[in-house]
Every structure is written in C-alpha cells, then in structure tokens.
C-alpha cells in the first residue's frame, strides 16, 4: 500500500509540473511575418502569371560556387529568391544589384536578360519559389 501511495504522489507531482508546460506551449501565439511582397520584379516590371497551362509551384535550392556566374537568361514565370548564404552580384544590362545573406528579391517573368555572379568567399545558397505552369521552363538561357 505504501508503494502505491508513493507512486500516486509521484504521478501527481510529475503531472502538476508537466501539465502547465503543455498549457503554456498551447497559449504561445503563432507569428506570421511577411518577408517580401510586390506586384513588380527587381527591374520594376509588372508580374503576370502564365494562363495557357496548368499552374505549377516550384521550390528550388540553388548552390552557386565561389566565383561562378550563371549564363545570361530570362524567366518565363515570376519567382521569389531568398539568398540564404553568401554574396551575389545581379546584373541586368547597366543595372547592378548586390545581395548578401538573408536578403530576398522578386524576378518578374517580364524582365530583361540578366545573370548572377557569386562574389563572396563561400558558396552562395539560394532558395527559389517559382509560380510557373506545367511544361514551362524555369529559366531560358540566351
């Protein structure tokens, strides 16, 4: 009987400590923080969506080695780019933009040809979400 009483007291003590922790966790609020929102791309071009095919969302991780440069290209669908790590130089004609870790930008599907170069001393890691369509390429190299 004594063992049972000790076990019962232990169970009540443990649950009285842990139960408030669970209630506290449930009372914490979920926070939604907008990171980027625009109706235009990096070069000021309006964003539009492909209407001729089934919509398709794409999510990529892109790794650009130190000193590497992408081919000159365009995008037929709008995209959001987050530079998670590294430093980039984004060149569109005479317009040059520089980005560092934790910065983001939007590419319009109506934008001009451009290229991106890793100007940092570590591989650049980008996360890209494209609002595209089935069968539509993400990038068109020139």
What are these regions (language model features)?
Residues 2-6, 12, 16-56, 105-106, ...:
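A short, N-terminal "cap"/entry segment at the start of jelly-roll beta-barrel domains
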Residues 30-35, 52, 70, 90, ...:
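Membrane-topology and secretion signals of cell-surface/extracellular proteins
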Residues 43-47, 100, 113-114:
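Short structured motifs
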Residues 56-63:
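Short proline/glycine- and basic residue-enriched helix-capping loop/turn segments at helix->loop/beta transitions
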Residues 52-55, 67-82:
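A short beta-loop-beta micro-motif enriched in histidine and acidic residues
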Residues 76-94:
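Glycine- and acidic-residue-biased ligand/ion/polar-headgroup-sensing regions
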């Amino acid at each position: 009987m004594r063992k049972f009483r000790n076990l019962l007291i232990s169970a009540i003590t443990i649950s009285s400590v842990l139960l408030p922790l669970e209630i506290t966790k449930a009372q914490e609020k979920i926070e939604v923080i907008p990171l980027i929102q625009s109706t235009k791309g990096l070069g000021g071009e309006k964003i539009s969506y492909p209407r001729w095919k089934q919509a398709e969302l794409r999510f990529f991780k892109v790794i650009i080695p130190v000193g590497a440069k992408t081919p000159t290209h365009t995008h037929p669908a709008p995209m959001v780019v987050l530079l998670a790590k590294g430093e980039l130089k984004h060149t569109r004609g005479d317009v040059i933009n520089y980005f560092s870790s934790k910065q983001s930008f939007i590419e319009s599907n109506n934008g001009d040809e451009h290229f991106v170069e890793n100007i940092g001393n570590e591989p650049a890691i980008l996360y890209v979400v494209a609002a595209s369509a089935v069968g539509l390429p993400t990038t068109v190299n020139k």
